[in-house]
UniProtKB/Swiss-Prot annotation:
The lineage of its organism: Eukaryota, Fungi, Dikarya, Ascomycota, Pezizomycotina. A motif (YPX[LI] motif 1) lies at residues 444-447. It comes from Sclerotinia sclerotiorum (White mold). Pfam families: zf-C2H2 (PF00096). Residues 391-416, 461-472, 490-514 have a biased composition (Polar residues). This is pH-response transcription factor pacC/RIM101.
Amino acid sequence: MSSQDQQQQQQPAQTQTSTSSSSNNENATTATSSIQQNVVADDSLLCQWEKCSERCPTPEALFDHICEKHVGRKSTNNLNLTCGWNSCRTTTVKRDHITSHIRVHVPLKPHKCEFCGKAFKRPQDLKKHVKTHADDSVLLRTPEQSGGSNGGYRQPGGKVIANLQHLAANPMGYYDHNASMHPGSAGVYGNSHHGGHSGYYAPAHSQQSSYGGGPGYYQMSHNPDLGQHAAWDEKKRNFDNLNDFFGAAKRRQIDAHSYQQVNQRLMQLQGIPIGTGGGISDYIHSAPQLVPIDGHGGHGHGGPMPQHQYSLPLPNLRTKSDLNSIDQFLEQMQSTVYESSNAAAAAGIHQPGAHYTHQALNFRQSHSPPQTHIHNIGSMAPHVSTSYASAPMTATHSSHSVSSGTPALTPPSSSVSYTSGNSPMSSSGMSPISRHSSTSNAAYPNLPAVTLGYSPHHSATAPTSTLGTNFDSDPRRRYSGGVLQRSAGGLNSSQYRESMETSTVGSPTPSPKETTPRPESIVKTEVTNNIDPALSDAGSPSVRSVDTLESARDRAEEAWIENIRVIEALRRYVSDRLQNGEYVKDEEDEDVSMADTDMQDTQVKTEEKPVESLYPVLKTDDDDE
């Protein structure tokens, strides 16, 4: 054998010797540690109560020994409420308290944390410990879905703890409109890629949690939610305003015969969507969106959770008597608004040929003010502006001649004159302004409207317009008016004579003296320029003042028409609730019905009583004969 072979045989022998020596050392160390542990365990399981040195095999046995032998029970007349462990001397008032205190001295820890495996002596200690885990994050994950080293805590058996429903301090769950709090299972919250869905929020890595649990839901905190909350606040204000109005109407805090008070209260309700169903329809348009944060963009959830539409009841409009009372009050308010002479004349209610055309909404041929469902207007497309949707109806007839295109002037021989109450300039303030006399205009000829030549909104059967002032719905040309006399510098002499001849067809031609307006018939205020504004001096102060006056008149007319719309919508809402029975039965009606039933029962019982008297009847000899 060579020297190399001998060296190779010696090396495995040395390796085996070193391995056996190391294993012996390990066994010796293990035995020493086990002996030390047994000694410590024996010391901890030794009863240290006064005058007792009993040794128990387990902590449970030691605890039972102390409770039964040293603490005792009240039923056996040996109850001891003072701790005798070493020199503790803690005194309690109940047996449960002393037994709970004994757990401090006994190495019994039956309450184990399901996250980290740490054991505790008392359940309240475990509850406090679990809260430290819950404070980290309410969004939990499992190691299978995390895919990294941040896996969930594992028990010694290797099972992943993913359920906290048995823990008292469980803050996890999400709110579902169809049910209550759901305990989660197998959710995700970790360092996964952020999906493309814009509605899901990707948490920062510093807030990551590695605890197993259920899916967490965060409320979206993007800028669109700010606008949504603002819309909720606006709807809440509208709801409060409507409820306050019904309350004031029920308590008669509004003078229904005063147009000023009625106008002031109705202006607060303009623009409020008044629907049916117990209050403001779609008061909550949609609940706050709760979106799951699973780290994958939420591709498997199919969009946000379904929301439910509902409407809130009005506290001041609950019973049937409230509905009837408010309906009568609204009828009085409606008659007050309609009977306002200046307002009705300004809107053309008393004009025989007036018909209304609302731009892009509807077409009506009647003498009543326009009626539209306010909630329908409010539910139009978002790109339609509110001012356009709530624009008032405009009368489409005009007082101009078709042939000449000039204003039709009133013959001075007319016996009808303006009074102080119906003068075009007699009204002031925000109240609607009268532009026509309420007396009969049979002496005036009926002239076709100038808008019939080019307006597509008119039909062939539309009634002809009489002399009067209204505005054309066509934005190409707008005629202002109200004054039936010649404007300064508006027409030359030949055009004036032609217009006079056209306006007095079938009647004797007035003399030149009669055609000249008399000074006493001219209103001593600013007159309206009846010619096309494009042909006049736009920079003159008179034109600017006339435009200001016209804009004030327009605002007054719009306010009056909006008041009519609001009243009609309110009455329609109240009548719908009465017809559908959407109210709470009055207690008075129930009391009256119960009283009627009691009266009927009393009458029936009275009739059922026997006719015979309760006392004996003494008969005489005459009665026998």
